[in-house]
């Protein structure tokens, strides 16, 4: 590129470059194309004069073609030529240079920089470089790669500047067509708004280009890394505008084109802008991105590791990619087929039937609203319960279903409901289409513009969703952090790669922008209501459920750090003092949140409510219990019952509690009755006080086998096994006369407790837990002798095996505070022993503990 004359010493100052063959050199200073071509203080090279002549030659069209309507197709043809030269001409050269080092090889084979060569092309190229760099520039002291890049830059200057100039000519000719049409046929406020917004987009586009060039310099602007590398520039730069959006030169770097279309009020300009932007995205995908991955991307080992992590992620989904919308559809998977049927029914079948049945618009609308409300309430409620109490996970683990199944089945529920909402929304608009859009629209102008913007928003939502899945995988897409502990997942930290580099919550707006697009295309009141429901639900779910759960799991430092957009906004668009103040306020707010003992989340409020319910129970004194149990008429009775084997309560408030016995422990009862009135058919029964307190003198309730005859006037009997209640509560013994249910005496009430069993988190202590369970429960209920005895064989001696399993699961759940279900004992993939059961309980405990672990 042309530059001012430099001294030899200054030429040696600058960044260091290295070719792909290993030669190092000092990279001289270069300038951008605008300064090179239009700054009069910068010397112009031979090719630069030719480029300027080509640019100004476009003005000949205005002189030679007086009819403006004829100029438009001419400039459109020019623009298409230069745009194709850009994306396919430069693209072809860069592709070959990246793959085969083709441009450098051509230079070497043609001896372009060999002063001894007699070819006219070589002499012209050498003269061109001398005119760019100055007469003192020593071509031989620089590698052929750098010199080739200097020549390549001139071709880039010609194509890019011609592309932009011809586009401006298209804009100008379209704007002034039909006597300055862009200023007429609209209300003045609308014209002014259009001009202000259009100029705003152009100014923003200009800022993006300037900021991008200041960040990456000429080296990257002219694709220098296709020819050589700069030392200490081995990583991609994420600063300035590159921290705001991915590939800003190709994304928001073309937003000014749409500003020009808005100013010109021309669909022709809009189509040209879309055409150019579309080709640029193709160039990015097929030329730029492959080279970026080659130069700056991960190594093959890292790529393979990433693929393995993705495959490992699929273990939560039966090792198959789960259905997202209708993507990853598998006709052999029942849930996928059902989703397809439901989507087809709500999107097409119901609207068609409703249309053929007359005006059923209200039915279709309320159906869409009802389904969205159902999805919002059910998904938000389930996520809240899962975050608070691990509701979903507990149910699966208690039934001995693998942890991964909970996430897989949740994914089916979540995706099915989401599919229903979008299918019903589509069905609502399909019905309006079938009816000829008889519903009154809020506005009906600019149909083509509305369709373009609407489709663009729908595409944006699809692209953002795809980018989210690429960044966080299916695990993150389906809220895996709610269901799977961090130690079971490949995601140990929140990702800041992909789209999350620029936005903390990209789905906050872009996750529902497609619904906004539907409203823009069909702006009916019904679509406005649906749009509001989608946006409101999305806001609540992200900010009041997902965000607070992420803080629990990953901590505030990871969740609340500024996104790339926020950093750039603070750095470039607001004063430094205010930016610093905002940062300090954020830190202070985080410190305040750490110091507060109370929480603001929905789940913690629910937790406090449950605790209040537990502590609000009225306590009865021991005397009150005795009075409740015993009739005062028995106080001086000749009949007596003494219960032995009870333990005295040693707790702080023992005055409120009766004596107790551990569940399953034998209870010995001694009776005494008058010999002269004693009958061999007198009997003693065991009852729960809450079931018999309404009748003191006569028992109206069956003892259900928990009784024994008193054949002697005095004696004792031990209640054990099936003659006991195997659940907590307050109980009593009753002495009955002569085979009847007439009560002669009621014993002192006593409590049956389930002893607490501590569950360790260390697998090595599984044997200790197994022995504890064996002694306290299994030896008493099933008569097992060791932790390795089969539970199934011992339970089969009972008349009702399933009832035994239900009883065991209930007792063990209460004792260990780890919920298990009867199905735990029905699995045959491992020996069904107390030892294996203890291992399962420890596993469940570890999972729930890790899910409940809140970062400070």
UniProtKB/Swiss-Prot annotation:
Its EC number is 2.1.1.17. Disulfide bonds: none annotated. The chain crosses the membrane at residues 47-67, 74-94, 156-176, 188-208, 244-264, 267-287, 337-357, 363-383, 410-430, 440-460, 509-529. Pathway: Phospholipid metabolism; phosphatidylcholine biosynthesis. It is a multi-pass membrane protein. GO terms for cellular component: endoplasmic reticulum membrane. Catalyzes the first step of the methylation pathway of phosphatidylcholine biosynthesis, the SAM-dependent methylation of phosphatidylethanolamine (PE) to phosphatidylmonomethylethanolamine (PMME). This is Phosphatidylethanolamine N-methyltransferase. It comes from Scheffersomyces stipitis (strain ATCC 58785 / CBS 6054 / NBRC 10063 / NRRL Y-11545) (Yeast). The gene is CHO2.
